[in-house]
Amino acid sequence: HKAIRRQRQMCIRDSTNLYRDQLTRNGHPEWVYNAVKDSIHPETQLILNADDPLVSCFGYGRDNVVWFGAGNLPTDTKEFVGVYNDGAYCPHCKSPMTYSSYHYDHIGNYECPNCGLKRQDTSYTVTSADLEKGEITINNKYKIELTLKSLYNVYNLLAAFTVASITGVDGNTIAKSLSNYVLKNFRVVTFTLGNRKGTLVTSKHENSISYNQSLKLAASDKDKCDVLIIVDAVSRKYFTSDVSWLWDINFDLLKSDNVKNIVLAGTYCNDLATRFSFSKVDRNKIKVIKDIEEAVDYLDNDRKEKIYVITCFSDKGKFLEKVKVD
């Protein structure tokens, strides 16, 4: 908190974990919100995601706020899609909230009829997004090509663009620097397994909104694919075997014709299988293989379909050591 107070400028965006997460670490999003809010100096300039109602509360009653967000996107929905809706009630007055559109989960265009909390007009806006093509446009002018074709990544890039722009960097320079940016922390890794190509997406198990975006990345691939989900450890820091967060994840996203096989692996494979038994995914697509090496061997075949691996920081090395990292 002292470190935050020393900062005159602060960026709070959609990836700051103001979502449901592991109880042993983050408690509840509103608890985290209050802890951060109390640490913000009154003169701090905030850079906020206007599409997240809880994050937007940081700017409630403040003038020194720069807002970023997404405009109307082709993937928007009129109804909420997911397991739970953290945007159902206003984070400010707790009254029922209305949405004109959802980008994903509770991120979208919202308004509270009671207290007036609503999505603010944005200075930096994703005005178009073609995830299949892998391209977004900011403020109808700056085009950025995507390496990771997910809305979650779009918001990260938009936040980075906003911060760089308000600090004086030319927009064209920012767009060029961000285009085809590859994460250096191995959150997303491409690999080869025999004759098959694949992508490992590191997803925090307990953050269901992040996890949903990883599932959607696989499900929306226009090519056929197999999906390997590994839950071998729950936390790197805390000793816990709590897997209740599995029930917050929208595994129905894998009910897609392009997803041919789903392999569940790791210590908690049977917990995964139980969760999948309550999903709409075809049971015939699901195979449970506890041993990770055996799961890799099962996928090492002559098929040409791409492989998506979805796992956490603790478990990704257990898979990557068995394949050729590109």
Where are these regions (language model features)?
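Short, structured coil segments at secondary-structure junctions
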Residues: 7, 42, 61-63, 279-282
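ATP-dependent carboxylate-amine ligase
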Residues: 87, 94, 104-119, 162-169, ...
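Single conserved hydrophobic/aromatic residue that forms the stacking wall/gate
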Residues: 1-12
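Short glycine-/acidic-enriched loop or helix-start segments at secondary-structure transitions
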Residues: 5, 24-25, 56-59, 77, ...
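Generic recognition of short, well-ordered alpha-helical segments
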Residues: 7, 27, 158, 210-213
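Acidic, Mg2+-coordinating active-site environments of NTP-dependent enzymes
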Residues: 15-194
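Short beta->alpha connector loops
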Residues: 6, 52-53, 204-207
